[in-house]
Amino acid sequence: MIQTISADGIGYGATLQNHFLIAMPGMRDERFARSVIYMCAHNAEGAMGIIINRGQQLGFTDILVELGILERSQSIRLPARARNIAVRSGGPVDRSRGFVLHSDDYVVESSMAVSEKICLTATVDILRAISTGRGPSQALMALGYSGWGAGQLEAEIADNGWLACPASPELLFDAEIDTIYDRILAANGIDPLHLSQVAGHA
C-alpha cells in the first residue's frame, strides 16, 4: 500500500534530494506538464533538479562537435556508450549550459554527489572523458535545469502540483523517455488514472 503524507510535512529539516518529482494533473505551469524531475539539491535556500523526460533536438555527438571536442568525421569512432547517451531538456533555467547525471564510477573534483550512486558534473572534462571511453558507465546529459527559490517548491507541492517519490538509478538511466513517467508511477504502485487522488509523497 502506498503511504502518502501531507505536503505540509515537507519542512526545511527534510530534503527531496535524490527524489523524483512527478507533475500532477493539477500542475498549473504548462512547461512542466507530465514532467519527471530528478532532484539534485534541496535545502532551505531552494531546490534544483533536471527534467529527465523531455528530449533535445541536439544529440550527444552534436554537442561534442559544437564544443570542438570532436570532429564530425570522427563521430564513427565514438565508443558505443557515448553515442547512446541521451540528451534531455533539463528545464527553463540556463538552457545553454550542460549538466551530466552519472554513475559514481567517475568522480572528479567538480562532481557533486547527489546520492551514494548518482553524481552531477557540469564541466566539459566529463564530456571529453565520455568521448574517449574513460567516462562513467551510466550517464545522461541535460541542457538547462529547473530551479526554485526558498519555499517555492514546498508551496507548489502543497498546491498539489507535484508528487515526490524516491529515485533509483535503474529508472533514472534505463527508462525510455516516453515511458519514464508511467514507469515511475508503476514502480510506486500508483495508477495514473488515480493520480489526482494522491498528494505529497509516495
Swiss-Prot record:
SUPFAM superfamilies: VC0467-like
Cystine crosslinks: none
InterPro entries on file: AlgH-like
GO cellular component: cytosol
Pfam families, per the entry: DUF179 (PF02622)
Annotated family: Belongs to the UPF0301 (AlgH) family.
Listed name of the protein: UPF0301 protein Meso_0753
Species name: Chelativorans sp. (strain BNC1)
Upper taxonomic lineage: Bacteria, Pseudomonadati, Pseudomonadota, Alphaproteobacteria, Hyphomicrobiales
